[in-house]
Amino acid sequence: MIQEQLAHLLEFLPDYRPFPPVKEHTAWQGLPLRAKQRFLQAGEAALQTPIAPLPLSLWLDFTHTGRRTPWETAYFSRRARLCALVSAECVEHKGRFLDEIADTVWAICEESAWQLPAHNSYVRDTPQLPLPDTTRPIVDLFAAETGALLALTRYLLPDELDTAAPGITARMERELDARILTPYFTSHFWWMGNGEEPMCNWTSWCTQNVLLTVFLLPTTQQQRKAAVKQAAYSLDCFLKDYGADGCCNEGAQYYRHAGLTLWGCLEILSNVAPEAFRPLFRETKIKNIAEYICNVHVEGPYYLNFGDCSPLAGRCGAREYRFGQAVGSDALQALAAADFRADADPDHLQNPDGSTHINLWYRLTTAFAEQELMEYAAVPQHRSAVWYPSVGIYAARQGSWVLGAKFGSNGDSHNHNDTGSITVYKDGRPFLIDIGVESYTKKTFSPQRYEIWTMQSAWHNLPTFDGVQQLPGAEYACLLYTSPSPRD
């Protein structure tokens, strides 16, 4: 689907300009007052918060104990700090935050590795190496996030940064070339796609952030064309694992990192090459992927959940709204706008998985869409029943009740042994629950995964016969004698 569009590429690929640089300050002054106040409040709090240290002992804590939280808490706090400081400087533009921005940028550039300890391996699903090899950078989810963050920081404040710390933007460009661009163009990471090998949210998520890095930096036309070609291949590998119905087998929480980052990729590609990639938003499969989140939404903050997904999968906002606009979905725009207005934390500063509050592009996309979101008046509507045959997910509503049923198999990404399980809500509140997953550790994505009690069928809404529980694998599936029929 995506690679077919390469035939329509023009010779020149321009910069991606999602927002004006800060020196074009009129647009920033025109942001809603509420957004500017949030940014300044977060930036001022960051000024009072020192840069978190990342000593070797924190990395080795994962190596020795398998705990992810100690390293990741400090790692994410650095990037959240930079997001807050840059956002504040963008709306104020008086230089008050520049020294701390430069300090934080420098600290991130000085890190030995941008990948997480939990992702420190070169071959998919193999044990992590005890220490990073600084001569062979790994582009994982958060190396790619870091690349996009630094690239956007440099794009927004190039002159200001070099005034505060002469030469710092050149350092940023060198690090981005060494840690993101060169590895991407010269190595093969599993998430880039490999024929029929199954992909997951890593593919669209990493690709989105690499594309941001490529098109926000002063890269060559050769690099840009190579990135577009690789991205098209990777996204086709990603899309092959989706059925025509658009169901995300990783659940609502991972839609934010899968379907929404697919939108991110297409947003970037359709801006730098509209004649080639904008028509993709008219594809029925892309629209179905976009609207999945509407169909598993229960009410308020709750979503039908299975596998590793939490029932509190995060509020919708600007990205969902823009995806809805792109594919022509009134339902998605209405849900996104209503959810945004109900969200006490629209910048997701308290996001529990640490992955949205470090993304500056998401934060600024929200600010520049905020006025539209506040004014969009349509009321969200839910379908009475939805059946996703590609994954085996059924959702139905009757009166005050909402039912979610997981058919399908135990071979999903982020799988639990939960085929046949159900969840129920009454009056918008949990009635029969799926507890989701505990904090990730080294064991979570290892051969010992199903030793963890939350992964086992006995801890889901399922029977256990004579002490025998379900087993993992696509061959362990629910047999349907009559398929549910969706009713509109």
Task: List each language-model region with its residue ranges.
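Long, well-ordered core segments of solenoidal/helical folds
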Residues: 43-54, 101-119, 168-193, 226-246, ...
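Solvent-exposed loop and edge beta-strand segments that line ligand/cofactor-binding
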Residues: 65-78, 90, 127-144, 186-204, ...
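Well-ordered alpha-helical scaffold segments within catalytic/enzyme domains
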Residues: 81-95, 145-164, 206-221, 260-275, ...
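Active-site lining segments of carbohydrate-active enzymes
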Residues: 129-253
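Carbohydrate-active enzyme catalytic cores, enriched for enzymes
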Residues: 259-431
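Active-site rim segments in enzyme catalytic domains, especially the processed small/beta chain
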Residues: 417-480
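Extreme N-terminal leader/anchor segments
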Residues: 1-33
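Conserved small/polar residues in nucleotide/adenosyl-binding loops
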Residues: 481-488
